[in-house]
Amino acid sequence: MSSIKLIVGLANPGAEYAQTRHNAGAWYVDLLAQRHNQQLKEESKFYGYTARLNLAGNDVRLLVPTTFMNLSGKAVLAMANFYRIEPDEILVAHDELDIPPGVAKIKLGGGNGGHNGLKDIQSKFGNNPNFYRLRIGIGHPGDKNKVVGFVLGKPPASEQKMIDEAIDEAARCTEILLTDGLEKTVRRLHSFKAQA
């Protein structure tokens, strides 16, 4: 079993970004809150929207930073320090270019894959990358020069449906992570692929 005390959904703040691919991590946290009848509330000392859940008998905090993506670490560190949460008790959900829509993967540790939100969290924790990552596939535009416009764009309805289905499965697998650990979660989540 894994001891997760903080689940973070990376996003850019503001209505103009709410439906963009880069906010997929926040979509996942929003779904977790909804499933447990909780409302995310803005808490300025944590630079984000927060909620508290009982997940499979565990006391878990949710956080969607209201900083811009490249300053996400400020919010995560503030909450981790306040509640004395270690990096390996944190799950960070984020959009992933290298995974197609309809697929989500989870891992512990690893690099940042050029993701500015992950980069900032790593630097704020003294480059200790040993936190869990939920990588929500958004696909790749095929040209690295188009990446910024792609992640800040809205997916078409067909892709959105697949991303939503992968997030739904990831939300179900979150409890498996807490009760049965990473290996079982990987087996189930990594075998899921939403149908177009």
Curated annotation (Swiss-Prot):
Q: Where in the cell is it found?
A: Cytoplasm
CDD domains per the UniProt record, alphabetical: PTH
**Site entry: Stabilizes the basic form of H active site to accept a proton:** D95
Top-level class of the enzyme under EC nomenclature: hydrolase
This one is known as: Peptidyl-tRNA hydrolase
Please cite one Gene Ontology biological process associated with this protein.
rescue of stalled ribosome
Extract one GO molecular function annotation from the record: peptidyl-tRNA hydrolase activity
Q: Which organism is the protein's source?
A: Serratia proteamaculans (strain 568)
* SUPFAM superfamilies, per the entry: Peptidyl-tRNA hydrolase-like (SSF53178)
Q: Which InterPro entries match?
A: Pept_tRNA_hydro (IPR001328), Pept_tRNA_hydro_CS (IPR018171), Pept_tRNA_hydro_sf (IPR036416)
Query: Got a GO cellular component term for this one?
Result: cytoplasm
PANTHER family noted in UniProt: PEPTIDYL-TRNA HYDROLASE
Could you name the active-site residues?
Answer: H22
Q: What is the phylogenetic placement of the source species in the record?
A: Bacteria, Pseudomonadati, Pseudomonadota, Gammaproteobacteria, Enterobacterales
Its keywords, alphabetically, are: Cytoplasm, Hydrolase, RNA-binding, tRNA-binding
Q: Which Pfam families does the UniProt record give?
A: Pept_tRNA_hydro (PF01195)
Q: Which family does it belong to?
A: Belongs to the PTH family.
| PROSITE patterns reported for this sequence | PEPT_TRNA_HYDROL_1, PEPT_TRNA_HYDROL_2
**EC numbers:** 3.1.1.29
- Residues carrying the site annotation Discriminates between blocked and unblocked aminoacyl-tRNA: N12
For tRNA, which residues are the binding ones?
A: Y17, F68, N70, N116
Keyword check for ATP-binding, yes or no: no
Q: Domain of life, per the record?
A: Bacteria
Role description: Hydrolyzes ribosome-free peptidyl-tRNAs (with 1 or more amino acids incorporated), which drop off the ribosome during protein synthesis, or as a result of ribosome stalling. Catalyzes the release of premature peptidyl moieties from peptidyl-tRNA molecules trapped in stalled 50S ribosomal subunits, and thus maintains levels of free tRNAs and 50S ribosomes.
